[in-house]
C-alpha cells in the first residue's frame, strides 16, 4: 500500500517532485527522465508511470529562469527514450508475449489490458502505435501487442518514430510555452489532473464501445 500511495502522490504532485529532482541532481535529471519514460514505454510492468504530465511539467520547469534545463536537449533525449522503449517492448511481445499472458490470475499481466489494446487495433489498425502514445496504459501495451501479432518491424518502426515525435514535442513544448504563465503556475496541479483525465478518457470510451459491441454480438 505504501508503494501505491507513493505513486499516487508522485503523479498528483509531479511538479513538486520533479522540481526537487532538478534541485538535488542537476543535469542528472536528464538521465532520470530518460529512464522513467523508457520504463513506461518499454516495460509492460510499468504502465502506470505518468508520461504525459511528466513531459508537460518537465517542459514547464525548463522555461523557468531558475533552472538550467535545456528544453531542446530534453526533447531529443525523451524522443530517443520513447522510440527505444517501444522497440524493446515490441521485441518482448514478439518473443515472450503469449507466455507472459498465459496466466489468467496474473496481477501484472492482465488480459484486460490486452483486450483494451486489441480494441484499439481493431478500430485504428497500425496507426494504433501513433494514437496510443496519447492514451495511458494503451501506449505501454500497443507495441507489445504489435510484437505478439508479428507486425512487420519496418512498419512498426515508422509508426514508432512518428508517434514518439508527436507525443514528446506536443507535451514538452506545450509545457515550455505555457508553463511559466502565472495562471498555469497557480493551477498546475489542476492542469496535471486534467491532463491525466483527458489522456485516460479515450481509453475509457474505447472500452465502453468494445463492451457494447460484444454485448450486441452476444445477443
Curated annotation (Swiss-Prot):
What does the record say about the knockout?
Normal growth rate in strain ST258/RH201207. Increases susceptibility of strain ST258/RH201207 to the polymyxin antibiotic, colistin. Results in production of LPS lipid A that lacks aminoarabinose (Ara4N) in strain ST258/RH201207. Significantly reduces virulence of strain MKP220 in a mouse Swiss Webster strain lung infection model. Bacterial burden of strain MKP220 increases in a neutropenic mouse Swiss Webster strain lung infection model, by comparison with untreated mice. Increases sensitivity of strain MKP220 to nitrosative stress.
Keywords on record: Cell inner membrane, Cell membrane, Membrane, Transmembrane, Transmembrane helix, Virulence
Q: What does the record say about its membrane topology? A: Multi-pass membrane protein
Q: Please indicate which superkingdom the organism of origin belongs to.
A: Bacteria
Q: Where in the cell is it found?
A: Cell inner membrane; Membrane
User: What InterPro entries does the record point to?
Assistant: DedA-like, VTT_dom
Asked if the record carries the keyword Kinase, the reply is: no
- Record flagged with keyword Isomerase: no
Give me the segments passing through the membrane: 25-45, 73-93, 161-181, 188-208
User: Which loops or segments lie on the Cytoplasmic side of the membrane, by the record?
Assistant: 1-24, 94-160, 209-219
Q: Which residues lie on this side of the membrane: Extracellular?
A: 46-72, 182-187
A single GO cellular-component term from the record reads:
plasma membrane
Role noted for this protein: Could be involved in undecaprenyl phosphate (UndP) transport and recycling. Involved in biosynthesis of LPS lipid A. Plays a role in virulence, probably by allowing bacteria to resist the host immune response. Plays a role in stress response to nitric oxide. Involved in maintenance of membrane potential.
Instruction: State the NCBIfam families in the record.
Output: PRK10847.1
Q: Which family does it belong to?
A: Belongs to the DedA family.
What name does the UniProt record give this protein?
DedA family protein
Q: Which species is listed as the source?
A: Klebsiella pneumoniae subsp. pneumoniae (strain HS11286)
Q: What gene, per UniProt, encodes this protein?
A: dedA
Amino acid at each position: 500500500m505504501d508503494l501505491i500511495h507513493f505513486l499516487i502522490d508522485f503523479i498528483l504532485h509531479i511538479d513538486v517532485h520533479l522540481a526537487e529532482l532538478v534541485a538535488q541532481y542537476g543535469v542528472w535529471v536528464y538521465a532520470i527522465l530518460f529512464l522513467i519514460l523508457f520504463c513506461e514505454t518499454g516495460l509492460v510492468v510499468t504502465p502506470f508511470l505518468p508520461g504525459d504530465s511528466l513531459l508537460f511539467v518537465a517542459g514547464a520547469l525548463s522555461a523557468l529562469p531558475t533552472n538550467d534545463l535545456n528544453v531542446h536537449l530534453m526533447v531529443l533525449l525523451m524522443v530517443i527514450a520513447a522510440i527505444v522503449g517501444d522497440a524493446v517492448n515490441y521485441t518482448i511481445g514478439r518473443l515472450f508475449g503469449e507466455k507472459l499472458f498465459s496466466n489468467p490470475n496474473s496481477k501484472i499481466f492482465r488480459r484486460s489490458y490486452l483486450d483494451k489494446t486489441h480494441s484499439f487495433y481493431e478500430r485504428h489498425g497500425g496507426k494504433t502505435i501513433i494514437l496510443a502514445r496519447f492514451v495511458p496504459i494503451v501506449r505501454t501495451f500497443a507495441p507489445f501487442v504489435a510484437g505478439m501479432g508479428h507486425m512487420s518491424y519496418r512498419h512498426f518502426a515508422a509508426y514508432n518514430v512518428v508517434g514518439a515525435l508527436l507525443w514528446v514535442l506536443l507535451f514538452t513544448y506545450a509545457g515550455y510555452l505555457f508553463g511559466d504563465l502565472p495562471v498555469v503556475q497557480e493551477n498546475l496541479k489542476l492542469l496535471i489532473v486534467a491532463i491525466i483525465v483527458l489522456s485516460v478518457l479515450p481509453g475509457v470510451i474505447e472500452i465502453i464501445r468494445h463492451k457494447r459491441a460484444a454485448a450486441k454480438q452476444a445477443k
